[in-house]
Amino acid sequence: MSPENDRVPTAIRPARPGAASSHEKLTPTARRASVAGFVGTIVEYYDFATYGLVAVILAPQFFGTENSAAAVLAALAVFGTAYVARPLGGMVFGHLGDRYGRRTILVTTIASMGFCSALIGVLPTLDQVGLVAPVLLILLRLGQGFAAGGELMGAVAYVLESTPNGRRGILTSITQMGATLGFSIAALVVGSVTAVTTSEQMSAWGWRVPFLLCLPLTLVCLALRLRLEDSPEFADMVANSEVKRAPLLDAVRQYPGAIVKAAAFTIATTAASHVGLVYMSVLLIKTLGFDSQSVYWTTALVVAVAALSTPVWGTISDRVGRRPVMIVATVGTAAVVYPVLWAMSSTSSIVVVGMAFLVYMIFTQAFAPGLTAVSELFPRRVRYSGSALGYNAGIVVGGAFAPYMSAQLVESTGSALSPALLIVAVCAIGLAAAISIRETGKAALRK
């Protein structure tokens, strides 16, 4: 029997000795881990969201002005290239994180992401250096993606391993809330720059400002992470000589089913969230004709409010389990996406657009406990490797090209409602994964 199937049923699995109850006070280690994970995911998704938000403005600077629709599609395709590099980054950093510790790798990933983003802010344009400009942009996006491949699931693993049983859902959801807030901050920054510049200034140099601001955000996160110790679970692994020489290979050989389920649920998670976080701004500005400044401000507000629901979903998952919340996320998102897109395309009121967008985003936040469950599927010796591999394999399909595919659907059908077909399809995949996954919410963290 494989290690993946050779497990004690959840209902009778004993808690590990000394495991804290859900009522035990959080330790300083757990609090520091949660804050560091939260700030790190803010930086990660600020970096990624900034590109998506300025894609419409950036497109002619790197891909020409002869065909504006083609330039936007090219810019969104470059957005997807960063995700293509994520699986390799997940494999490399996951392997290193299981061998040498979570903290060291999390410092490396956030530094790499931040510096790549800042360099985008100083790139020459197509008019200045010709085809070298889009090539450099693609290389930096690949660098971002490679580093990001080791970031989120490493942060989730670190927080899980520093948190008492019964509190893992709430604290890891706070880490994941940082992803949504990172996007909101990016929208706020882009909206602010748009407000104080003319359209000509924004096209000439204003788009660079949000990328350059990645640098101070990265330095703050580095200061926090450099003060951390490694997770108690990893320290215990070292003390008991449990660190494996090839954790990535062990994960693939011993837990293939868990990796596939992780990838399947991630397809739904990332496609649903990225259509909301990245493509909606393109749809509202380019297709539906809303003012860009209004869209950025509305997006920032809606996403910030929706982010507040993330810890609520995490708390619910600690009480009722991960699977019920995962099912609500997939079914709820699929159910509301068509009405939301219809409401957006049938009104000229940015307030109505914002309210519809908020409904959609609240349901997408319910996916957060699913990523916690993904990490909980693996024992600590391969947790970073296995979860990062599964997550990043899924994100290539779900996150990389969901905005691009949405734009193509609208372009080919002429209907602003057509991206709903994509979301319903990926949510069906996520629902199948949620139903098949074992419940981990109330079980002790696997050793």
Please report, for each region that a protein language model flagged, where it lies by residue:
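Central cavity-lining transmembrane alpha-helices of secondary-active solute carriers
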Residues: 76-95, 114-116, 300-313
